[in-house]
Swiss-Prot record:
The lineage of its organism: Bacteria, Pseudomonadati, Thermodesulfobacteriota, Desulfuromonadia, Geobacterales. It catalyses: UDP-N-acetyl-alpha-D-muramoyl-L-alanine + D-glutamate + ATP = UDP-N-acetyl-alpha-D-muramoyl-L-alanyl-D-glutamate + ADP + phosphate + H(+). GO terms for molecular function: ATP binding; UDP-N-acetylmuramoylalanine-D-glutamate ligase activity. Pathway: Cell wall biogenesis; peptidoglycan biosynthesis. It is found in: Cytoplasm. Its main location: cytoplasm. Belongs to the MurCDEF family. ATP binds at G115, T116, N117, G118, K119, T120, T121. It comes from Trichlorobacter lovleyi (strain ATCC BAA-1151 / DSM 17278 / SZ). The keyword Transmembrane does not apply. This is UDP-N-acetylmuramoylalanine--D-glutamate ligase. GO terms for cellular component: cytoplasm. Cell wall formation. Catalyzes the addition of glutamate to the nucleotide precursor UDP-N-acetylmuramoyl-L-alanine (UMA).
């Protein structure tokens, strides 16, 4: 793709927008970068891009920068139905996401991983598996560095692994991973999408341009994912905790079995550091992606036996008075909380925060079976109590610190206190990381 002298506009100057503008300028494009924030708010961004031939339009957008451009690159935070983008496409101008732009310049086999939950752990693990097996590997996308930083660096790599969000998939046209993985789909981001189906459709676009030469790694146990997978053009490679597979990877007592083209590999699970049923699925998905692209069993097993859980994903904090405390602040939707609840019994669950629009009803059975006490915080507390409060002993707390102390008082020896909110954090905290740190601090003060 030739970019030299092309009129390009980058909409939105968050992390991917900055990286895209830098790359386009390096390629010799005529770059306009535009953001609704003003110069003061973007001082750090402007210093990052200083010295590059970029024209900035700040505090507003000019329609002509879009409709008269050769190419518009949209940051994932910009809604797809933005009026300016509608006018741009009507004018016949190509609109792409940063991952679409990046993929046109990446020559290494690309592994792209999406799903409502587990993306970051699976992506990180896949990258570490490739590296342990001796492949020079770039890991980025929705975590760490934007995917466009790979071609921008000019560094040759043998494998690329990208975490991909539904937002990033909205503006693809030729994006084609060698291996695309869809881990699961549950209700999320209904504050962004007009319907659950629209969110599902966005996720499924990860497979859109694959052919029979590519692989689609999909969750056999997620009926929605599995049904959608039947119409894909790529070779299906499922993973499952519940089904034995003739082609795919599945768990059996004490081992994972990887079956591909008549060959079988057994991978013992006893030494895995990652715990929880959700992490077993993440491990299977990552292994599938990597074993399909040249990784070896022995080296991969060595890595799995030392790979630790990422922060804020069902992370053990400490044990006090024979009660274990786990922090799962990244669990901002019902699907991720369900996986956490499946991993424990005798739970005191701290949940709540800023409501994201989905139903909490899918948690009902697990709450009834496994949660002894439900401690609710934040804006969503009232609605969560309406949907789940009759299923177990339910309490409200004004602060997270109060919730931790209340949970300590309520939980019997042998039990588990789990922060797994099913909500975003923005009603009470800057982000999920601050919520996690406040929880950890409160637990350490017990």
């Amino acid at each position: 793709m030739e970019l030299r002298t092309k009129k390009t506009t980058v909409m939105g100057l968050a992390k991917t927008g900055v990286a895209s503008a830098r790359f386009l300028a390096q390629q010799g494009a005529r770059v306009t970068a535009t953001d609704m924030r003003d110069e003061t708010a973007l001082a750090t961004v402007l210093s990052e891009l200083a010295g590059l031939d970029i024209r900035f339009v700040l505090g507003h957008h000019d329609e002509a920068d879009f409709t008269a451009a050769d190419l518009v690159v949209v940051s994932p935070g910009v809604p797809q139905e933005h009026p300016l983008l509608r006018k741009t496409t009507e004018a016949g101008v190509a609109v792409v996401s940063e991952i679409e732009l990046a993929s046109r310049f990446i020559t290494a086999p690309l592994v792209a991983i999406t799903g409502t939950n587990g993306k970051t752990t699976t992506t990180t693990l896949a990258g570490e598996l490739f590296r342990a097996n001796g492949f020079s590997t770039y890991v980025g996308g929705n975590i760490g560095d934007p995917l466009i930083d790979l071609p921008a660096s000019g560094e040759p790599v043998e494998r690329a692994v990208a975490e991909i969000s539904s937002f990033q998939l909205e503006w693809i046209s030729s994006f084609r991973p060698k291996v695309a993985a869809l881990l699961n789909i549950t209700e999320d981001h209904l504050d962004r999408y007009p319907s659950y189906q629209a969110y599902i459709n966005a996720k499924l676009r990860i497979f859109e341009n694959q052919t029979a030469d590519d692989f689609a790694v999909v969750n056999r146990d997620d009926e929605l994912v599995w049904q959608a997978a039947q119409s894909l053009k790529a070779q299906l490679f499922p993973f499952s905790r519940r089904h034995e597979l003739t082609e795919g990877i599945f768990s059996r007592e004490g081992e994972l079995l990887f079956r591909h083209h008549g060959q079988e590999l057994s991978i013992p699970t006893a030494g895995f550091r990652l715990q929880g049923v959700h992490n077993l699925e993440n491990i299977m998905a990552a292994l599938a992606c990597c074993l399909l692209l040249g990784c070896q069993r022995e080296t991969s097993l060595e890595l799995l036996n030392r790979f630790e859980a990422l922060h804020h994903r069902m992370e053990f904090v400490r044990e006090v008075a024979d009660v274990r405390y786990f922090e799962d602040s990244k669990a901002t939707n019902v699907g991720s909380v369900a996986k956490a609840l499946e991993s424990f019994e005798n739970i005191t669950l701290i949940a709540g925060g800023k409501d994201k629009g989905g139903s909490y009803a899918p948690l009902a059975e697990l709450v009834q079976q496994r949660v002894r006490h439900l401690v609710l915080i934040g804006e969503a507390a009232e609605r969560m109590q309406q949907e789940l409060g009759d299923l177990t002993a339910t309490h409200k707390a004004a602060t997270l610190e109060e919730a931790v102390q209340l949970s300590a008082d309520l939980t019997a020896p042998g039990g588990v206190v789990l922060l797994s909110p099913a909500c975003s954090s923005f009603d009470m905290f800057k982000d999920y990381e601050e919520r996690a740190q406040r929880f950890i601090t409160a637990v350490k003060r017990l």
